[in-house]
Amino acid sequence: MRKVITAAAGSCLLAGSLGALSIGSEARASDVVGHAYVNQNTTGVNTLSVFDRHADGALTPTPGSPFAIGGAGLGKGLGSQGAVQASGDYLLAVDAGSNEISVLRAGSDGVPHLVSAPVPSGGVTPVSVTISRSGVVYVANVGDGGSNYAGFRLGSDGSLRPIPGSTVAVPEGSGVGDVLFNEQGNRLVGTRDNTSLIDSFRVGEDGRLTAAKGSPFEAQSLGPIGAEFRPGSPDQLYVSNAHAGPGNGTVSAFRDTGNGTLKSIGSSPYADGQTAPCWVEISHDGRYLFAVNTASANLSSYTINPNGTLTLLGTTAFRNGAGAVDARLSPDGRFLSVTGGRGHLVTTFAVSGGDLTELPSSPVALPAGGSPTGLVVL
């Protein structure tokens, strides 16, 4: 089982497990331009909550939401980023309670349809999944007796098949918080939040992993969880460090030297002066980074300079004081949605450079029950 190092660390796990608030949402008149999906992580049969995404950024529940997805959730916080991901019309969601991955096809109306029976995750307690452009999939499993990175291939028909010889064991108790590919799909990293290490791998044409020289690397602070590669600069990696205690949150910046070896950028790690930055998101143009400070109930905004160093711009509070458990930008980059938190909510901000303004229609409520973890915005 995963250990909690500090109260701040626990906030990343517990933020999504509190009771739901009753938040009303007005019907929106603007056109539906897409959808948002949240892994509810419910026990018994797991579900996805789905929202219609409107042109003005507002979210309204899709009729029939939430939808059953086949496997079982864990019902408590996963402390991870990437519990649901998308590739084309397909959605992949972790079922942490049944050690499975569900593959669904999203309809034009946003309704997800299960492609087949959930697939075993290749380990115990899957918490994060990532998909490369070529259809290689890796899952981070964190449970005792099956803590690893396990590889699969996603077929054009939505089939998910294990890659022989792809599984890489991770020491039990490491608590992997995120697994992700770079844009090119030739590098993969995983964060070990309980031991403050970062795994880095080269990805072969066969989809199997080779550990980079020197891996795992020191995270530069306690509790690395969320991670993102910089769009347009696949050699630059940013990791949020959540466990250093009140007011001591940081974001680490690394450069891949070309073979998967990670080197520090500038004076990394970069302080945000907040508590438990558990998740990160980067603007599509690669110019701004947003860190979600779960225990401080706010977001920090940074400028990413051309050389990869960070400059802190400031913080933006959630209107209702809620924490958070994942964040994603809309495809056009105009809106940032943050899911989970105290009360089962999705909060949405308008984005202007590094400035964030919560929408008047925000937040919207998620169904009670489970522990919402993971967000996809399409």
Descriptions of predicted regions:
Residues 16-34, 41-42, 208, 353-355:
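C-terminal region of N-terminal signal peptides and the immediate post-cleavage residues
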Residues 31, 69-87, 120-136, 168-187, ...:
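Beta-rich, blade/repeat-based domains predominating
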Residues 41-43, 53, 96-97, 106, ...:
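Short loop/turn segments immediately following the C-termini of beta-strands
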Residues 45-49, 100, 146-150, 197-200, ...:
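Structural motif
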Residues 51-59, 104-111, 151-160, 200-208, ...:
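Short loop/turn segments immediately following beta-strands, especially the blade-tip
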Residues 63-75, 114-119, 163-170, 210-218, ...:
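A short beta-strand motif characteristic of beta-propeller blades
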